[in-house]
Structure formats: C-alpha cells, structure tokens
Amino acid sequence: MLPESSLSFLKRLLDSPGPSGFESIPARVWREEAKTFATDVRGDVAGNSLAEVNPKGSPTIMLDGHIDEIGLIVQYIDDEGFAHVGPIGGWDPQVLVGQRIRLLGRDGDVFGVIGKKPIHLMKNDDREKASKMSDLWVDIGAANKAEAEERLQVGDPGVIDSRAMDFPNKRLVSRSIDDRIGAFTALEALRRYAKNPGKARVVAVASTQEEIAWHGGGALICAACLNPKMAIVIDVTHASDSPGMEKKELGDHKLGSGPVLTRGALINPVVFSLLRTAAEKKKIPFTINAAGRDTSTNADAIHIAREGVATALVSIPNRYMHSPNEMVSLEDVERTAELIAEVCREVGERTDFTAR
C-alpha cells in the first residue's frame, strides 16, 4: 500500500482548489512535496511544475499528469447579488444543482451554493428537461450587487466545495481526481525511481490546462523544453464496473484491476511493450485499452512535440468522471506508480524507440 506520508500528500493535493488556468495552489503543494526527494524542482511561465531525478542521466523520460481540474468562473453579478457562472472544462450541469461552491475571491475563499428554481415552481414540461448552465446561479448570501462585489469580481474561479474521503475496499472519493491523481502518480513513480535509479534522467511534470486546451496545454510546452526521448502520460479512464457502462465500447477496466495500458494509433509500440513486459515481470495486474485514433489526453500533443516523442498512456480506472465525487482504487494508483518506476529503470541510452 501507499505509505501514510504519500496518502497525506495525496489528500492535500486533491483538496487544493485549482481549475484550469488557476492551478497555482495545488502546484505549490506538489512542488513542496517534490523538494523532499527530487534533485531539482521548478515551475515555468505556463504554471507547470517539474521535478527531476538523475539530471546527468540519459535518455530523458517525461512523466506527465495534468494537475488542473474542471471548475467554474464568475461571468456576471446581478443587482440582487447573485453570481452567474460559466464552466471551466466539461461539466454536466445536472450534477451542479444544490452543490456548495468554493470561489477564489480577491481576499480569500468565498463560499456559496448553486441555486435553481425549485421543482415545486416548475411547469410540468420544465421538470423533464435537463438543467442548463444558464438555469443556475451562485448564492453567496449577499444582499445586493455592491455587497457581492466586495468579495467577488468577474473572472474569479471556483470549484465544488468537497473534500477527499476514504471509502471501503481501499477506495478514495474526491473531486479533482481527473487528473490530480495522475500528477500524484507521476511524482510517486519518481520517488520510487529515486530510491533505485537507472540510467535515465527522469522528469515528473504536473502540467496545466489540459481540461481546456485541445492542443495539449502545459504538457506540450514541457515536451518542447525537455525534449524527452520517451514520455508516459498518466491520466484516468472510465471504470467499467458501475451501472450503465458499455464494455463493448469502453473495454473492461474495473476498480482494482490495475493500470490500463493504451494500445493504438498514437502509442509508441516499443514503450507499450516495455510497460507490458514490466507488468508481467513484476506480476502487476493490468488491462489494455484499444485506441484507434486520438486519446483525448496529453499524449496526443506530446507524441508530436519537436522531432517526435515515444509516448505511452497509462490510465487509472475512475468512476463518475467530471463530477463532484470521483472514485478510484488506491491499489490501482500504487500499482501504476510501481510499474512506471520499473519501466524507467529499464530504459538506457541503447533503448531504440524506433517502431519496427
């Protein structure tokens, strides 16, 4: 299992508010933890955080997990003091109704509740309709616009006000698991690599803006700067073991079944083979996801950076993605970190990533 110190760090990371474009709070938490063992820790102008082990080693391996989460942003404050918000990233507005929200105001946190017309007052036809973002507002308890603007301004971001919780069977529930769990796992893999390093220079990256940037956001910037020969992207994928999930379309990736190794059009076959071989050698359970086109992750951008990067995608099964309460297995997280650390030890200057 993950040590208590790592679990404590993970919960601090998950509880930190940091929607896309506003990731500075979780980024600081990540960098503070990285400084406890990494050789070099730094940030960049795009908000990315980087931690490095074996800086004189070769080749360079990039481990990427995006640290941003979906959120909300204040677009308008009306005369009655209600804030009207838009999405940062992809929300199902249905899950927002009645939630408590934590807005990052100019002088600190501002808490509110997301309101909607009560069902008692709706016409019959409206009761059957799905909520739209425009149907919702945020009530911060202000009496009027002037009072609200003392605490909030247009452009202030926010997240759902919830905290990480332990669940039975070594499961963890939190908002921001997509993909702060990937940023955590990248650093946890680096920590394990640091205890028994191989020949490679390994850089863990907590990248920004994945939820809003189709071009790869902060991950593309890091890939251009680091010029890695190999990259492993760590993200989440849909767990297949909750009601309504179609395994014929998604594959079979249950909570607790281990890391999910993607195989497909954008994935370097050499790196995929390294991952599968290492998992079999270490007796780490895993499943395979087939991707016939793009993956909708940072892997899509990283693999075409500079002259091209040998890229793989390792995912952690996640229930209830893009909701206030996502769920993962801590066993899957630990196995993913252990697998990635082992693969990094297997790579050296003679490793040929050319697909043959």
Mark where each language-model region is.
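N-terminal hydrophobic/helix-forming segments and targeting peptides
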Residues: M1-R356
